[in-house]
Amino acid sequence: MSTIALDATYTVEPQPSGIAVYSRKLIEALAGLETSHHFLLCYRLSRLARRREFLRPAPKADAQESRFSIRLFQEPLTFWLPWQSDLFHSLAQRPPAFRFKREIVTVFDIFPITGHEYSSPDFRRKFSALLLEAVERATRVITASRYTAEQLLAYTSVSDSKLRIIPLGVDLPSLTLAPVERLLARERLVGEGNEMILSVGVIQTRKNTLNALRALETLPERYRLVLVGGDGYGSEAIHEYIRRQGLGSRVQVRGYVALGELQALYQSASVLLFPSLEEGFGLPVLEAMANGVPVVAAGTASLPEVGGEAALYVDPHDPRDIARTVQLVIEDAELRRKMIERGLKRAREFSWERVAEATLKVYDEVLSL
């Protein structure tokens, strides 16, 4: 039996990001697999103090609970002794403070080191140093897309032999609204006779929210945009644009919402618009498809890998192309029907159980070295 330590710090985030969702779902799925490995869940105390909700996954059988234990980073003499664990898996693109016998890191995106100004200079400097060290030290590097793998090959010293691509999973909704219920829910949100364009993700420069707003300005008045997500880098300019252009009556800024409310918003939407300029995976694309919503996404970065033939793609730098495609999806009932059907089929190809099984194979591969 081997002991595998995982940096589970992001599982206790009160407003889970993509990394937090990945961390939670991977750990929960690992708990459901048959394996002799023991998993050590590790937390940075500064994060743990925020919330104590997710400390240990709920195992499917009592016998599995013994395979999970917890260490806080406040106990360096008991946690950081490298021989305590046979393998360390960083789920958050950063290395542990001390070296382990074997290390794996999952990398989602590397935009801070590609020259794009999608974050502050201070963040880019700190992130770049941590990422480069993590990749250099790792025995294997897991990415969620071929796009990120190719970026790592281009911008770091990682070799192709170290890379393993494991796409993320998606949960099918626990409750699905009937078409009439979806329409009523949409009318409650944006008014009778109006169409609801949903945008899910942090409101920031990288998510291309400004061009989504510019596209909205060229669409009929009855088209409304609902933004779901907290504020990020560049959000001030986005909020100022909404005020300056007088879009307050057509744009709802809902901030972060819990999972149950998010599913309801997906199922109320006419379309998901996801024109992100840089994306390592793009989980909202699959989430929308799983909830029976057609998707219009940027035809760049990893998004075509995720959406496949089930989504329609646009030039994210061209607001008119975005607007034309959104209107086509909303106005063409037969196209919508086909996209929803293809989207549901596409979403079923991705599961967290498959993510856990593929990750476990990487663990076994590294442990055998």
Regions found by a protein language model. Name each.
Residues 1-369:
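Carbohydrate transferase catalytic cores enriched for Leloir-type hexosyltransferases
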